[in-house]
A protein has these predicted regions:
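C-terminal transmembrane helical hairpin of 12-TM major facilitator-type secondary transporters
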Residues: 327, 331-335, 341-374
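Juxtamembrane helix-start motifs in multi-pass secondary transporters
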Residues: 82-84, 192, 348-354
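Helix-loop boundary and gating motifs at the non-cytosolic
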Residues: 2-58, 259-264, 268-296, 300
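Intracellular loop-helix junctions on the cytosolic face of multi-pass helical membrane proteins
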Residues: 1-10, 107-116, 127-128, 132-133, ...
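Residue-level signature of mid-helix packing/kink "hotspots" within the transmembrane helices
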Residues: 56-60, 64, 161, 329-337, ...
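Loop-to-transmembrane helix entry
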Residues: 44-54, 112, 150, 187-188, ...
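Helix-to-loop junctions at the C-terminal end of transmembrane segments
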Residues: 61-78, 334-348
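C-terminal ends and interior cores of transmembrane alpha-helices
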Residues: 83-108, 357-371
Length: 374
């Protein structure tokens, strides 16, 4: 018989979700600065997208493995917390080493070191994020699920905004340099990653220490599971060929609406990845009028020197991209408040299509604006 899951206080829900702030802080720093870092380390403008392939590949590989493994784990730390803590420690390592890639030039080319650290960060963020979502689902009763997701959304947006603007703040408020020569990383970016690593580890440790997961028997009672059901989770897996066959059968039998949505999502992610990969060079060229030749490592290596105006423009543009990404997170948070009501009034398809259309127009509008304040 299913027992009633205890209700949590506001601060208990806050503690369960608090680590999301740190994880999203790290994601925001990565999204706004990885192209900037790799470009400074010597990546060609046209090869940046190859480095960014790491993110979806790691997501495809890591999330299902970690999700399945955490479902089968019960130890002194609990079910989800071991993965959250391990992922946070690995992510912190990547966040510290990535901006310091030039220090390892005796062992690895800085660009290769940077690529490896991006891979480590992406894998680690996924190790953190998947169990975090499951932890909220495990700990928060259905009657408080909306409150839980609201707090989660608030913390995610706070982390995204602060992480995005941090390099700008370190330069314009603290006074750190935001410029770097080829093969180096700007001090403001280096310190932003140090601070991000500290915030990530601190918030995750807070959640791990302040949250006590349910024991297996308690969890089974609250979720209405029998003793036999968890045991089936440890049953031997079907052969790979059988699992692939089942996967393609599921895809074939997927409802028509889901297939249509999959196509739309497929193309909409094009825009998101172009934004993450190329916003920094696009803003630098279009707003700061830096010629594209100054993104060519071969041209820079052959030039007698890089003009100070080019170096300063690249640094300022990189900081401003963080401001743009912070604004993106703020407006997304505001719009999400009204999204449900708009969908109820006009229908989900209409609201979704309108949102995509507005997003497309916003993309095109980058060509029309030549000033920072526009």
């Amino acid at each position: 018989m299913q027992a009633t899951q205890p209700r949590l206080s506001f601060w208990q829900i806050w503690n369960v979700s608090f680590g999301f702030l740190g994880v999203q802080f790290g994601f925001a720093l990565q999204n706004a600065n990885v192209s900037r870092i790799l470009s400074d380390l010597g990546a060609d403008l046209h090869s940046l997208s190859l480095f960014w392939l790491v993110a979806p590949i790691m997501g495809l590989i890591v999330q299902p493995i970690v999700g399945s493994a955490s479902d089968r784990t019960w130890n002194r730390l609990g079910r989800r917390r071991p993965f959250i803590l391990a992922g946070a420690i690995a992510a912190v390592l990547g966040m510290i080493l990535l901006p310091n890639a030039p220090l390892f030039v005796a062992f690895l080319a800085p660009m290769l070191m940077g690529a490896l650290m991006v891979a480590l960060m992406d894998a680690s963020f996924n190790v953190c994020f998947q169990p975090f979502r499951s932890l909220v689902s495990d700990m928060v009763p259905p009657s408080q699920r909306n409150v839980g997701y609201s707090i989660q959304s608030l913390l995610i947006n706070i982390g995204a905004v602060i992480g995005s603007i941090l390099p700008f703040v370190l330069t314009n408020v603290i006074g750190l340099e935001n410029t770097a020569q080829m093969g180096e990383v700007a001090p403001s970016v280096v310190w932003a990653f140090y601070i991000g690593a500290t915030v990530l580890l601190g918030t995750v440790i807070w959640t791990v220490v302040r949250t006590k997961e349910y024991a297996p028997d308690e969890y089974n009672r609250y979720k209405g599971l029998t003793e036999e059901q968890p045991a089936t989770e440890k049953a031997p897996k079907a052969p790979l060929g059988q699992r692939l066959s089942e996967f393609f059968t599921l895809v074939k039998d997927m409802p028509k609406t889901m297939k249509q949505l999959a196509v739309v999502q497929f193309f909409s992610w094009f825009a998101l990845f172009i934004m993450w990969v190329y916003t920094t060079p696009a803003i630098t060229q279009h707003i700061w009028n830096v010629d594209k030749q100054w993104f060519d490592p071969a041209y820079i290596a052959a030039a007698p020197m890089v003009p100070e105006t080019i170096i300063m423009a690249k640094g300022a543009a990189g900081d401003w991209v963080g401001i743009l990404f912070a604004a993106y997170s703020v407006f997304a948070a505001i719009f999400s408040i009204f999204l449900a009501k708009l969908a109820d009034k006009f229908g989900r398809k209409t609201v979704y299509a309108s949102s995509l259309a507005l997003g497309g127009l916003s993309y095109v509008s980058f060509l029309l604006f030549q000033d920072l304040t526009m």
